[in-house]
Structure formats: structure tokens, C-alpha cells
């Protein structure tokens, strides 16, 4: 398999991209975190769950390497002259783990995309970004939008949303989760200057009582759930994810908010990352928390997210994996998997310090 893969250095890839970037498919085999911190412009992140990796037994199907059906179809049709694999800094494929993402991707491409030349990028992203920084996209250390907290509030916001003050969760501005996805509070949603500065075109209001202030200017989607342990937020996951994707595909940006931007809206953002990037809850949670440190979904929402994880990462695993999240929670299923996250009690608008309840969250084990 290694003999069928060519070697490119940073200069070779730069020349290849200049000749025809549209005819070169870049597959980045690094982690979700590493890819989002910085990647070659136009590259696609390759990742799959531990369960899928284990079941592959060294022979991963191309549908797991390139899950996007359109890209995979172009690849199989010979539309790409070259496919380039890369990791962080490896000098060759010789040292790649046999069950690692890089080796599994190379094997699948050599078996199923035989009409396309497969290359390995020598030195990986580290060497290429040092040599060709202008061809890379890097995300700076995430910080909220720095705008002054005006004491004036739009007339539409003065009545109906009591959280439009400046407690901790309203300070700063919305935070960027992905280039097209932002998270924040109802106060931020009442600040048209903030939304316009970020290029927001649509909002998801994850509450039953916060108003949509600017319906004539932005596209809105309402998810009327309360922040309590009886609420079934998981029934909205797929609908919210599809809405975010539709805005992204149209070139827009989505701002997701609830009352405080801590529990309900954070849960929706976590579900989006888990399904679209096929990552585990703990990885998605850490990714979002690095950007908005006060996120703290309530106990029930965390349980529903853990059940959603089993559906996302092992969709063909068993009947249990596809069962509704709330049904599993109601059954009181015995547990063997324990995760520790900061988990909130329902949030109410007050100027007092935020309360956090540290406790392990459990759910039924995935297959």
C-alpha cells in the first residue's frame, strides 16, 4: 500500500495547488481540534469514531474517509488529478499506525480510487504552514466580540426579555464556534450592532419567552424549550442542525442564543458539532468551552447529548443506539460510562454569581 502512495513536500504541494486547486483533494487526518486551530485552505478533515475504526479491522471503506457524497462521487469519477493526505508532522507513511486515520485513509484510497494518484505530504501541516502560511487558514485565540455594552436597549427589547442587562453571561459579545456559527445570550440577540458586525444572517432562539427583536432583518428559527430537567431538547437536534447547514450553504452565519447562552443554546451547538464533525461529546464540549467558558448544560440535556453521541458515532450499532434520548433517561438504565462536566441547574436571570453543580453525568454505554 505504501508503494502506491507518492511523496510531496511543501513546495510540491504549493505548485500542485497553483496549477489547479480544484483538481486536488486535500484530506487532513488530524484531530478536530488541530484542524480547526489551523488547516490548509480547502482541505477536508478526515475522522471517524473508535467503533467504526474497530469494526473496520484495517479495511476502512471510502464512505468513512470521504463521507460527503458529492466529493466522493467526484473522486470516484476521476475528477481529481491528485489526492493528498497529511497529518501533523510525519516524515513518511512508514511510521503511521496501521489502525490510525492516516494509514486507513491511504488504504481505502488505494483500493477504491485507483484512477487518482494518491500523495502523502512530507512534514505534514506543520511543515507546509511554515513554508506557505498564505495558503493556510488559522483561527486566532477565540475571544468574544469587543463592543461597548451600551446602556441603551432597542425598544423591542425593553419589554419581554428581563435578561437584557449586563450580568456575567451578557458581557463581551457573541463568540465564534465555527466561521458560520456563533453562540451567546438573549442580550446579544437584542444588539443589532453586534449581529451586523459579525455578519449574522439568521438566529436560533432556544427559549419559550425571549422575543425575536429584528424579524424584518434576520431569518429566525424558534426552539421553544425550557431550561429544566423535563424538557426534551433532543427532539429538536436534527431540525436545528439542518437549519444551521441551510444557512451555511447559503453563505450566511447563524447566531444561537437562549436566555443566558449557557445551557439550551450551548446544547444545540454541541449537538451540531457532534453530528456534523462526528466527534464525541467530551471533545465537542471542550471545543465550545474554550470559546465560551461559562457553558453548562443542565443534567438532562447532558444525558440527551450522550445518547445523541451513541446515535451519531454508532448509527448502525443496535436498536438502543437509535432510541429516543428521553426514553433512555426515563428508563433509568444502569450505567457504566461516566463523564465529568460542569453542569448547571436551570438558569434564571439574576445578577448573582452563576451557580455550577459538579457531578458525573452518565448514560447507557454505546455498543
Swiss-Prot record:
Active site feature? 258 (phosphocysteine intermediate)
Please verify whether the record's keywords include Nucleus. Answer: yes
Q: Please state where this protein is localized.
A: Nucleus
**Catalytic activities:** O-phospho-L-tyrosyl-[protein] + H2O = L-tyrosyl-[protein] + phosphate; O-phospho-L-seryl-[protein] + H2O = L-seryl-[protein] + phosphate; O-phospho-L-threonyl-[protein] + H2O = L-threonyl-[protein] + phosphate
- Tell me which Gene Ontology terms the entry assigns under biological process: cellular response to chemokine; cellular response to hormone stimulus; intracellular signal transduction; negative regulation of apoptotic process; negative regulation of cell adhesion; negative regulation of cell population proliferation; negative regulation of DNA biosynthetic process; negative regulation of ERK1 and ERK2 cascade
Q: Which residues form the Rhodanese domain?
A: 20-137
Tell me what PTMs the record reports for this protein: Phosphorylation at Ser-359 and Ser-364 by MAPK1/ERK2 and MAPK3/ERK1 reduces its rate of degradation.
Which SMART domains is this protein grouped with?
Answer: DSPc (SM00195), PTPc_motif (SM00404), RHOD (SM00450)
- What does the UniProt induction comment state? Up-regulated by growth factors and mitogens.
In terms of InterPro entries, this protein maps to: Atypical_DUSP_subfamB, Dual-sp_phosphatase_cat-dom, MKP, Prot-tyrosine_phosphatase-like, Rhodanese-like_dom, Rhodanese-like_dom_sf, Tyr_Pase_AS, Tyr_Pase_cat
Broad class of where this protein is predominantly found: nucleus
Principal EC category:
hydrolase
Q: What does the record give as EC number?
A: 3.1.3.16, 3.1.3.48
Q: Where is the Tyrosine-protein phosphatase domain?
A: 173-314
This protein's record includes keyword Ubl conjugation = yes
Record key words, sorted: Cell cycle, Hydrolase, Nucleus, Phosphoprotein, Protein phosphatase, Ubl conjugation
Cellular component (GO) terms are:
cytoplasm; nucleus
Which SUPFAM superfamilies would you find in this protein's record?
A: (Phosphotyrosine protein) phosphatases II, Rhodanese/Cell cycle control phosphatase
Q: Which GO terms describe its molecular function?
A: growth factor binding; MAP kinase tyrosine/serine/threonine phosphatase activity; mitogen-activated protein kinase binding; protein serine/threonine phosphatase activity; protein tyrosine phosphatase activity
**Which positions does the record annotate as the modified residue Phosphoserine?**
359, 364
Q: PANTHER family per the record?
A: DUAL SPECIFICITY PROTEIN PHOSPHATASE, DUAL SPECIFICITY PROTEIN PHOSPHATASE 1
Q: Which purpose does this protein serve, as stated in its record?
A: Dual specificity phosphatase that dephosphorylates MAP kinase MAPK1/ERK2 on both 'Thr-183' and 'Tyr-185', regulating its activity during the meiotic cell cycle.
Concerning its family, UniProt says: Belongs to the protein-tyrosine phosphatase family. Non-receptor class dual specificity subfamily.
Protein name as catalogued: Dual specificity protein phosphatase 1
Amino acid at each position: 500500500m505504501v508503494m502506491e502512495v507518492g511523496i510531496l513536500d511543501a513546495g510540491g504541494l504549493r505548485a500542485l495547488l497553483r496549477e489547479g486547486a480544484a483538481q486536488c483533494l486535500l484530506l487532513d487526518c488530524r484531530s478536530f481540534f488541530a484542524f480547526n486551530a489551523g488547516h490548509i485552505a480547502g482541505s477536508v478533515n478526515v475522522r471517524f469514531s473508535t467503533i467504526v475504526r474497530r469494526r473496520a479491522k484495517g479495511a476502512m471503506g471510502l464512505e468513512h474517509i470521504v463521507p460527503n457524497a458529492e466529493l466522493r462521487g467526484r473522486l470516484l469519477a476521476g475528477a481529481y488529478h491528485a489526492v493528498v493526505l497529511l497529518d501533523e508532522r510525519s516524515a513518511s507513511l512508514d511510521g503511521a499506525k496501521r489502525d490510525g486515520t492516516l494509514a486507513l485513509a491511504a488504504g481505502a484510497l488505494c483500493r477504491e480510487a485507483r484512477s487518482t494518484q494518491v500523495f502523502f505530504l512530507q512534514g505534514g501541516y506543520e511543515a507546509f504552514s511554515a513554508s506557505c502560511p498564505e495558503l493556510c487558514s488559522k483561527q486566532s485565540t477565540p475571544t468574544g466580540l469587543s463592543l461597548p455594552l451600551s446602556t441603551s436597549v432597542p425598544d423591542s427589547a425593553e419589554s419581554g426579555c428581563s435578561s437584557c442587562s449586563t450580568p456575567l453571561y451578557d458581557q463581551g459579545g457573541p463568540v465564534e464556534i465555527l466561521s458560520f456559527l456563533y453562540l451567546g445570550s438573549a442580550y446579544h440577540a437584542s444588539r443589532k450592532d453586534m449581529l451586523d458586525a459579525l455578519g449574522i444572517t439568521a438566529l436560533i432562539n432556544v427559549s419559550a419567552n425571549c422575543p425575536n427583536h429584528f424579524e424584518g432583518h434576520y431569518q429566525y428559527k424558534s426552539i421553544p424549550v425550557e431550561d429544566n430537567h423535563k424538557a426534551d431538547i433532543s427532539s429538536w437536534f436534527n431540525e436545528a442542525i439542518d437549519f444551521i447547514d441551510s444557512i451555511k450553504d447559503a453563505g450566511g452565519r447563524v447566531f444561537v442564543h437562549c436566555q443566558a447562552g449557557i445551557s439550551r443554546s450551548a446544547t444545540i451547538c454541541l449537538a451540531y458539532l457532534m453530528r456534523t464533525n462526528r466527534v464525541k461529546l467530551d471533545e465537542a464540549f471542550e471545543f465550545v468551552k474554550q470559546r465560551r467558558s461559562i457553558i453548562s448544560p443542565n443534567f438532562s440535556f447532558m444525558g440527551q447529548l450522550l445518547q445523541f453521541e451513541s446515535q451519531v458515532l454508532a448509527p448502525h450499532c443496535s436498536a438502543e443506539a437509535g432510541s429516543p434520548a428521553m426514553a433512555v433517561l426515563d428508563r433509568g438504565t444502569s450505567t457504566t460510562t461516566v463523564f465529568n462536566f460542569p453542569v448547571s441547574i436551570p438558569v434564571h436571570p439574576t445578577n448573582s454569581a452563576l451557580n455550577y453543580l459538579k457531578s458525573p453525568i452518565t448514560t447507557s454505554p454505546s455498543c
